[in-house]
Amino acid sequence: MKILQIPLINLKKQYETIKEDVDKNVLRVFSSAQYIMGENVKQFEKEFGEYIGVKHSISVGNGTDALIIALKALGIGEGDEVITTPFTFFSTAESISAVGAVPVFVDVRRDTF
């Protein structure tokens, strides 16, 4: 029996579509030697805030951190339950657990997914 191996995600395929822009900007950040905070981050946060029409925005290192910050901003924590779909990346449940809440999985509707 042959086992079909399906990768969890294919970041290489996604990267290839934006390679030129990513490479240019990564080199700009590396050249500045400011990988955390610094002018590049300030500029990104300013432009992103303007783009989405808010006064303040914060960039984070990954989606897990973003979810944790969002949950904390909503006051979600110990003893709370958060309803989510199991059809998601594992950091969704991880983030809910990280703030002390309990993930509650519900199915999605096939016709509205």
Set out the residue ranges of the language-model regions.
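PLP-dependent aminotransferase-like
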Residues: 72-113
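Conserved PLP-binding active-site segment in aminotransferase class I/II-type PLP enzymes
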Residues: 1-73, 77-78, 99
